[in-house]
Amino acid sequence: MKNVGFIGWRGMVGSVLMDRMSQENDFENLNPVFFTTSQAGQKAPVFGGKDAGDLKSAFDIEELKKLDIIVTCQGGDYTNEVYPKLKATGWDGYWVDAASALRMKDDAIIVLDPVNQHVISEGLKKGIKTFVGGNCTVSLMLMAIGGLFEKDLVEWISVATYQAASGAGAKNMRELLSQMGLLEQAVSSELKDPASSILDIERKVTAKMRADNFPTDNFGAALGGSLIPWIDKLLPETGQTKEEWKGYAETNKILGLSDNPIPVDGLCVRIGALRCHSQAFTIKLKKDLPLEEIEQIIASHNEWVKVIPNDKEITLRELTPAKVTGTLSVPVGRLRKLAMGPEYLAAFTVGDQLLWGAAEPVRRILKQLVA
């Protein structure tokens, strides 16, 4: 049974990973060792009924060297500090990472097994030892419309994202909720009075959002009652943000198409959802296909994608973050041909940023490695 070290298991993604591994009884097939950046020597948690002893220091290279597999959700700074030191010792175990630091390295594979199991299997045969979870929007896009890529039907795709606060971290989620609460408090008495002017209410809310003391330390701007059309840093040579660049770079790496890439681009926008990312796609298909056939191709790709009929009532019920949060379901709806021509397709999808967007691909590659 393989010795598997877990780092960053207390954080948001790590906690979701622990929950999913417990639900699927994954701890039965491995010996867990838990690491910490600040509390070495304290009692380790118990998952799957296994006593893992005491917490070990996440910076102790000698302890890390003893492991067959390391799973880290600690973030890119930790990876950048520890990974090269560990590899320099000759350690030859598997490194599984939820952070972005190693994604584009030649000796790393971005994992999303319902989409790129062929790439993963080939990498394992070649002796690849580094496996990294992908960008959340990219993974959720490929889970949603992977069938179109699998059938080589996509000429190009333009994406507009509607990304949840969770993608920016736990502090950002708290800030969003604080903003929402303050906006309601600013007009709570007026909301109770049906005779109050909605324009007066709007003016008060807007003034509150613009106030110097409105909490924006994490997002840098109001998100509650607003949106932020910018995620990550600017890439000056293209005008893209790094999040937008990932759509192209990671999609093609996941699919094994880096030598013959499919153009993927668009705009990434932060909205006031808590943990589900939504995306609107404009897709140029390589050929005109009947909509019914397109729906069948999408729906049959994996067991989690679900085609939602282009009907208002069903869409409002099934195709929202409120519905999808906390589930592995990846619904795709608003499917229709666009006025630009019969080979142009519109689609809209929603997916949980912490599940298929982060923890689940990591859980599933770990399951393969311990098998």
UniProtKB/Swiss-Prot annotation:
GO MF annotation: an example: aspartate-semialdehyde dehydrogenase activity
Residue positions of the active site: 136, 277
Recorded family membership: Belongs to the aspartate-semialdehyde dehydrogenase family.
Xref: InterPro entries: Asp-semialdehyde_DH_CS, Asp_ADH_gamma-type, Asp_semialdehyde_DH, NAD(P)-bd_dom_sf, Semialdehyde_DH_NAD-bd, Semialdhyde_DH_dimer_dom
Keyword NADP set for record: yes
Alphabetized UniProt keyword annotations: Amino-acid biosynthesis, Diaminopimelate biosynthesis, Lysine biosynthesis, Methionine biosynthesis, NADP, Oxidoreductase, Threonine biosynthesis
Subunit and partners: Homodimer.
A biological-process GO annotation: lysine biosynthetic process via diaminopimelate
Consequence recorded when altering residue 103 to L: 7-fold increase in affinity for ASA, 150-fold decrease in affinity for phosphate, and 1400-fold decrease in activity
Known function: Catalyzes the NADPH-dependent formation of L-aspartate-semialdehyde (L-ASA) by the reductive dephosphorylation of L-aspartyl-4-phosphate.
Name the UniProt record assigns to this protein: Aspartate-semialdehyde dehydrogenase
Positions contributing to NADP(+) binding: 10-13, 37-38, 74, 166, 353
PANTHER family in UniProt: ASPARTATE-SEMIALDEHYDE DEHYDROGENASE (PTHR46278:SF4), DEHYDROGENASE, PUTATIVE-RELATED (PTHR46278)
Superkingdom per UniProt: Bacteria
Record-listed substrate binding positions: 163, 243, 270
Ribosomal protein found in the keyword field: no
Reaction(s) this enzyme catalyzes, per UniProt: L-aspartate 4-semialdehyde + phosphate + NADP(+) = 4-phospho-L-aspartate + NADPH + H(+)
Outcome after substituting residue 270 to K: 2-fold decrease in affinity for ASA and 825-fold decrease in activity
